[in-house]
Swiss-Prot record:
Acidic residues composition-biased segments: 625-636
Composition skew (Polar residues), residue ranges: 601-613
PROSITE patterns attached to this UniProt entry: HSP70_1 (PS00297), HSP70_2 (PS00329), HSP70_3 (PS01036)
Keyword terms: ATP-binding, Chaperone, Nucleotide-binding, Phosphoprotein, Stress response
Domain of life (superkingdom): Bacteria
Induction field: By stress conditions e.g. heat shock.
Protein name in the entry: Chaperone protein DnaK
Keyword ATP-binding (UniProt): yes
Role description: Acts as a chaperone.
Family listed: Belongs to the heat shock protein 70 family.
Region of interest: Disordered: 514-542, 598-636
Phosphothreonine modified-residue sites: 197
Native source organism of the sequence: Neorickettsia sennetsu (strain ATCC VR-367 / Miyayama)
Biased composition (Basic and acidic residues): 514-530, 614-624
Length: 636
């Protein structure tokens, strides 16, 4: 594995970023971040990033944004209703009960949508390195649960990547920030407010060790929620002025969402901005326009509750870390929303110090992931770093009366393993069903069900006699594994958690094949476009040259060129790249006669004696002017 290329990817709700070692890689459009947007067009194309974003207004129902908010979630989760209300695309219930997306007449898992973004980032890395890239470290919000982490890992597999590690976004940011700052031990807080999620992590840095002390967060709080508050305000303002509700107009809503996001960004550096959307809708009286003066003060009043929601997780993380506010040496801001002055002010007030501003909040997570990827891939220049992360949520089982019994507490350093001995509740019981949950609530049903398994084939015995040791294991990715052993017989059994949701191996394989097939289609489509562009360019230049130099070649040569142009034009309408290339080559070959004529013309022109600049026409008289120097008296 040593020396292999491994990339770091920040798969974000709003934007994503890819890096190698400590360098951020630009995408095909030349941008350092890629919008996490995927669109399905009527002609069967899949657009990713900025091209998808640009057509969102006219194709809102088939343009998928913020799919990270759906990843690893059940359709019946409370947050799904809110997401369905906020976005124009359709969310459906998959056969396994997960939330999926319907677009372009097909259904997609959120992992598939994420995979499309990952493929674009992977291709950018391959273009940059000139080599095939198959390994990556992908980041997730620290507060992602097991299902969300597994679904993110699945997205990587669908994209053709071996996911070396899933790491927490704040931890990755700390890695990038603190790489050259581990000579002395210091405590840092990473405040990560991104497009869709919020995390805060408390870490101790020193002697090459990055140890996460505690983490907390909210997987449904981010820039998308800020945008929604602005959008709702604009809808109400328009309704007051015009008596029309824009909430049922998908086209208008998409324009409003884009305007809201733009205004939010502008107000990070200015006090006031104009939101001007002409022809936003129309009624019998004619077109309607939206024009609103929007101030920073108004924005801050609209989103103050959202900003306040970040403080409670900060308090919990500090408490769990065992540190006081004054013991935090540095506060690092991550995520685009931390550019908002009101957010910076709130963080400063809580921690009692100005946040560190030496990192790019949009790129630092990808850089940290790339540093970790380089270490795991055995890069020759990899630094000797130990990364100790934690599990964000407690892991346990349902016991008598529906109580949640914790086996691994939140903020336990991972990887970790815990064992618990169980027995039977009835005489001669041959099987035990164990339900595994993740969360912090007292009752099991209030937490996230990861899955359940049945341990079968227990020898007949009075109740309470069999000794079944069940081991819960959380790996370095934060993903849960379970095994069981019958202590009485010494026989070990492999137990697989039958998760109630998530993708099966068969589904993942099918999606991997679809992604590979789609990549071939995309390659063929690109080759066709390039072939047509080359053909049209050659036709234009040949016709131009023919009009200028056609008289310099024989009529038979001219006819051959005309025929070749006609042949090429006739195949342009066909979607056959090889045929277009064949006819392009034929035109290129016969038009060489034109090139020869042009060359001869330029040669003869350069051999003609050019007129002398100092020659005078016959009869022209050159008169030398007479002048007298006049001296300035004042200069004496």
């Amino acid at each position: 594995m040593a020396g292999e290329i491994a990339i770091g990817i920040d798969l974000g709700t709003t934007n994503s970023c890819v890096a190698i070692k400590d360098k951020v890689i630009e995408n095909a459009e030349g941008a350092r971040t890629t919008p996490s947007v995927v669109a399905f067009t009527s002609d069967g194309q899949t657009l990713v990033g900025a091209p998808a974003q640009r057509q969102a207004v006219t194709n809102a129902k088939n343009t998928i944004v913020a799919s990270k908010r759906l990843i690893g979630r059940r359709f019946k989760d409370n947050v799904i209703k809110g997401i369905q209300r906020d976005y124009p695309y359709k969310i459906i219930e998959a056969k396994n009960g997960d939330a999926w997306i319907e677009a372009g007449g097909k259904s997609y898992s959120p992992s598939q949508i994420g995979a499309n973004v990952l493929i674009k980032l992977k291709e950018a890395a391959e273009t940059y390195t000139g080599k095939k890239v198959t390994k990556a470290v992908i980041t997730v919000p620290a507060y992602f649960d097991d299902a969300q982490r597994q679904a993110t890992k699945d997205a990587g597999r669908i994209a053709g990547l071996e996911v070396l590690r899933i790491i927490n976004e704040p931890t990755a940011a700390a890695l990038a920030y603190g790489l050259d700052k581990t000579a002395t031990t210091k405590n840092i807080a990473v405040f990560d407010l991104g497009g869709g999620t919020f995390d805060v992590s408390i870490l101790e840095l020193g002697d090459g060790v990055f140890e996460v002390k505690a983490t907390n967060g909210d997987t449904h709080l981010g820039g998308e929620d800020f945008d929604r508050m602005i959008l709702n305000f604009l809808v109400e303002e328009f309704k007051k002025e015009n008596g029309m509700d824009l909430k049922n107009d998908p086209l208008a809503l998409q324009r409003l969402k884009e305007a809201a996001e733009k205004a939010k960004k502008e107000l990070s550096s200015t006090q006031e901005t104009d939101i001007n959307l002409p022809y936003i809708t129309a009624d019998a009286a004619g077109p309607k326009h939206l024009n609103v003066k929007f101030t920073r003060a108004k924005l801050e009043s609209l989103v103050s509750d959202l900003i306040d929601r970040t403080i409670e997780p900060c308090k919990k993380a500090l408490k769990d870390s065992g540190l006081k506010r004054e013991e935090i040496n540095e506060v690092v801001l991550v995520g685009g929303m931390t550019r908002m002055p009101a957010v910076v002010k709130k963080v400063t007030e809580f921690f009692g110090k100005e946040p560190h501003k030496g990192v790019n909040p949009d790129e630092v997570v990808a850089i940290g992931a790339a540093i970790q990827a380089n270490i795991l891939a055995g890069g020759s220049d990899a630094q000797d770093i130990v990364l100790l992360d934690v599990t964000p949520l407690s892991l346990g089982i349902e016991t008598l009366g529906g109580v949640f019994t914790k086996l691994i507490d939140r903020n336990t350093t991972i990887p970790t393993k815990r064992s618990q001995t169980f027995s039977t509740a009835e005489d001669n019981q041959s099987a035990v069903t164990i339900r595994v949950f993740q969360g912090e609530r007292q009752m099991a049903s209030d937490n996230k069900l990861l899955g359940q398994f049945s341990l079968e084939g227990i020898p007949p015995a009075p109740r309470g006699m069999p000794q079944i040791e069940v081991t819960f294991d959380i790996d370095a990715n934060g993903i849960v594994h379970v095994s069981a052993k019958d202590k009485g017989t010494g026989k070990e059994q492999t137990v697989k958690i039958q998760a109630s949701g998530g993708l099966t191996e068969e589904e993942i394989k099918k999606m991997v094949d679809e992604a590979a097939s789609k990549a071939d289609e995309d390659k063929k489509r690109r080759e066709l476009v390039e072939a047509k562009n080359s053909a049209e360019s050659l036709i234009h230049s040949t016709e131009k040259s023919l009009s200028e130099y056609g008289s310099k070649i024989s009529s038979s040569d001219k006819q051959s060129i005309d025929d070749a142009i006609s042949d090429l034009k006739s195949v342009l309408a066909k979607d056959d790249a090889s045929l277009i290339k064949e006819k392009t080559d034929a035109l290129s070959k016969v038009s060489m006669k034109l090139g020869e004529a042009m060359y001869k013309e330029s040669q003869s022109a350069s051999n003609d004696p050019s007129p002398k600049n100092d020659s005078t026409e016959e009869g022209e008289r050159v008169v030398d002017p007479e002048y007298e120097e006049v001296k300035d008296e004042d200069s004496k």
